[in-house]
């Protein structure tokens, strides 16, 4: 009993022991989570990297594929946007998949439907132009602002507006939400770098380091 009474006092006298124990615990938890993520990525790899219904940019034959789950109303997605662009452009050997994952309300859903409709009707180059516009757009996203974007870019506004409500668009969003749920992704941005998943914003230099590590692992 006396030993039991003394243990709390010993911890108070040596708090670094508790700090070290917490550090070891957190590292083990992170390692276990990484293993679970890796197993899930392997199981779902075909769905993740086939990019059915998604825009694919960068080098289509790149040796590393980055997948981004994003939302146009997400502040951290907007912060990551120029850095992802810079990474892909400067590297030259990255395949980028953008998965529309609207989770921040009706404006997010509206923007995602618009972008997917453009991809389906006008093609990947048109999607990229719209994606760039939406990632930097100020103010609310509504039907009028989206119609103005489509008109400015020379697209068929009526066709795109009609397509936005098509089941083909709904299926893409539903598939991305289902995939995110299975991957335990519930926030944006979330990234997949080859066989590593990172939830949340990643600075440019950190992304470069992850890509380098993925290449080194082969």
Identify the residue ranges that each predicted region occupies.
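C-terminal cap of thioredoxin/glutaredoxin-like
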Residues: 1-9, 17, 28, 148-218
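N-terminal targeting signals for export/organelle localization
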Residues: 1-44
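A short beta-strand-turn-helix
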Residues: 46-64, 88, 177
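Acidic/His-rich structured neighborhood in mature extracellular/periplasmic domains
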Residues: 47, 72-76
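Envelope-exposed proteins and targeting segments
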Residues: 62-65, 70, 92, 194
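Structural alpha/beta surface segment adjacent to cysteine/selenocysteine redox centers
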Residues: 67, 78-151, 181-186, 217-218
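Short pre-active-site segment immediately N-terminal to redox-active cysteine/selenocysteine motifs
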Residues: 70-73, 187
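Solvent-exposed coil/turn segments that connect beta secondary-structure elements
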Residues: 71-72, 99-102, 196, 203
């Amino acid at each position: 009993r006396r030993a039991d009474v003394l243990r709390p006092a010993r911890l108070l006298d040596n708090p670094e022991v508790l700090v070290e124990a917490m550090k070891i615990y957190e590292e083990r938890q992170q390692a276990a989570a990484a293993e679970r993520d890796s197993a899930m990525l392997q199981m779902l790899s075909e769905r993740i990297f086939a990019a059915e219904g998604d825009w694919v940019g960068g080098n289509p034959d790149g040796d590393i594929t980055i997948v981004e789950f994003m939302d146009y109303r997400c502040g951290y997605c907007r912060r990551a946007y120029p850095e992802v662009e810079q990474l892909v452009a400067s590297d030259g050997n990255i395949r980028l998949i953008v998965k529309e994952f609207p989770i921040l309300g009706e404006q997010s859903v509206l923007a995602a439907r618009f972008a997917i409709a453009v991809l389906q009707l006008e093609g990947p180059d048109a999607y990229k132009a719209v994606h760039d516009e939406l990632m930097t757009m100020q103010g609310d996203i509504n039907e009028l602002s989206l119609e103005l974007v489509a008109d400015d870019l020379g697209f068929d506004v009526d066709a795109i507006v009609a397509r936005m409500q098509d089941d083909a668009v709904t299926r893409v969003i539903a598939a991305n939400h289902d995939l995110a749920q299975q991957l335990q992704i519930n926030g944006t941005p979330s990234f997949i770098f080859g066989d590593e998943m990172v939830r949340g914003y990643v600075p440019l230099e950190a992304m470069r380091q992850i890509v380098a590590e993925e290449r080194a692992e082969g």
